[in-house]
From Swiss-Prot:
Similarity comment text for this entry: Belongs to the universal ribosomal protein uL13 family.
Classification of source organism: Bacteria, Pseudomonadati, Pseudomonadota, Gammaproteobacteria, Pseudomonadales
Name of the protein this chain belongs to: Large ribosomal subunit protein uL13
InterPro entries the UniProt entry points to: Ribosomal_uL13 (IPR005822), Ribosomal_uL13_bac-type (IPR005823), Ribosomal_uL13_CS (IPR023563), Ribosomal_uL13_sf (IPR036899)
GO biological process: negative regulation of translation; translation
Assembly and interaction partners: Part of the 50S ribosomal subunit.
Naturally occurring in which organism (per UniProt): Ectopseudomonas mendocina (strain ymp) (Pseudomonas mendocina)
């Protein structure tokens, strides 16, 4: 009996919508990353993108536990000497709530071209409205 290998052209991808309101950031991100990789499917193949599309709404209502709201730091660099920037969770969630979830999920995906393709299937929006109603996403309870 041969081992089954999924073909990229035969993979069926579904659309799911996840409500981040009141969810813990890390627990939400691990489930989303697993779904983007396709590990929940029986036809999962490590070298093929078998994951689904995930639409996250209410990104500004995600929460963290303990003192992480003030202690958790996000770093960026301008590329110039001494150009490192630092912002904590509270300020980033107020300025760009989508980036908090995107950063958490991206860190849980493979660091290669396949991981970048998986990351492109993640759509994060603040508020309950999203432009993907034509895809008829199913609600995913996490």
């Amino acid at each position: 009996m041969k081992t089954f290998t999924a073909k990229p052209e035969t993979v069926k991808r579904d659309w799911f919508v996840v409500d981040a309101a009141g969810q813990t950031l890390g627990r939400l991100a691990t489930e989303i990353a697993s779904r983007l990789r396709g590990k929940h499917k029986p036809e999962y193949t490590p070298h093929v993108d078998t994951g689904d599309y995930i639409v996250v709404i209410n990104a500004e209502q995600v929460r963290v536990t303990g003192a992480k709201a003030s202690d958790k730091k996000y770093y960026s660099h301008s590329g110039f000497p001494g150009g490192i920037k630092e912002i904590n969770f509270e300020k980033l969630i107020a300025r760009a709530p989508e980036r908090v979830i995107e950063t958490a999920v991206k860190g849980m995906l493979p660091k290669n071209p396949l991981g970048r393709d998986m990351y492109r299937k993640l759509k994060v929006y603040k508020g309950a409205a999203h432009p993907h109603t034509a895809q008829q996403p199913q609600e995913l309870k996490i």
